[in-house]
């Protein structure tokens, strides 16, 4: 996946860092918040899943002229912290390019991913975490269907084989 993201600082303070949510990586292993939630619901299917049944993301590169470093947070592997070289002023913006791949999980865990004949995609793109009053609200995937996002527009170009069909509940804006 090649993704271009543009962020505008609408908070009232300069931002030294930004946060991204990478919910595809919440299926990585038994240490993620999602794995713990599935286990708390007394389902052992995820705990005993084979690696090929689990999803993940692999980031090849995150680049911008204002990125110092980036890292996944230790305690939440589906949140990415991007440290900036210089703060983004109020009203300022940044454009980020991300090169990454995702591995879809077996849909039996949450209803999203793949099964024998279908792909069920939801919350699979990397997105900006929500920010309000200069406070970041980083949200890990807990399979609650409640990802709160910054207002954003998306332009997707998807290629697939002719024998497949694409269905979406996205609203098309012109």
Task: Report each predicted region and the residues it spans.
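Short Pro-Gly-centered flexible turn/kink motifs
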Residues: 2, 89-98
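Beta-strand-rich interaction surfaces with strong enrichment in secreted/lumenal proteins
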Residues: 5, 69-71, 83-88, 141-146, ...
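Asparagine-centered strand-capping/turn motif at beta-strand->loop junctions
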Residues: 7-11
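Short acidic/proline- and small/hydrophobic-mixed sequence motifs that coincide with surface turns
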Residues: 13-15, 57
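Short aromatic-acidic-glycine turn motif
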Residues: 24-34, 164-168
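Extended, low-hydrophobicity, Ser/Thr/Pro/Gly-biased non-transmembrane segments
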Residues: 42-56, 60-61, 97-174
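Short strand-edge motifs at loop-to-beta-strand transitions and within beta-strands
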Residues: 78-82, 94
């Amino acid at each position: 996946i090649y993704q271009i993201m543009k962020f505008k600082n609408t908070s009232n303070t300069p931002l030294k860092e930004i946060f991204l949510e990478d919910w595809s990586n919440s299926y990585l292993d038994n240490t993620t918040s999602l794995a713990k939630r599935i286990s708390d619901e007394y389902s052992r299917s995820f705990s005993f899943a084979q690696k090929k049944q689990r999803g993940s993301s692999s980031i090849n590169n995150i680049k911008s002229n204002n990125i110092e470093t980036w890292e996944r947070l230790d305690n939440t592997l589906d949140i990415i912290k991007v440290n900036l070289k210089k703060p983004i002023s109020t009203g300022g913006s940044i454009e980020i390019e991300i090169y990454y791949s995702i591995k879809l999980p077996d849909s039996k865990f949450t209803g999203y991913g793949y099964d024998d004949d279908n792909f069920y995609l939801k919350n699979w793109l990397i997105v900006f975490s929500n920010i309000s009053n200069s406070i970041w609200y980083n949200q890990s995937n807990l399979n609650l269907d409640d990802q709160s996002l910054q207002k954003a527009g998306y332009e997707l170009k998807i290629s697939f084989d002719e024998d497949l069909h694409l269905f979406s509940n996205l609203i098309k804006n012109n």
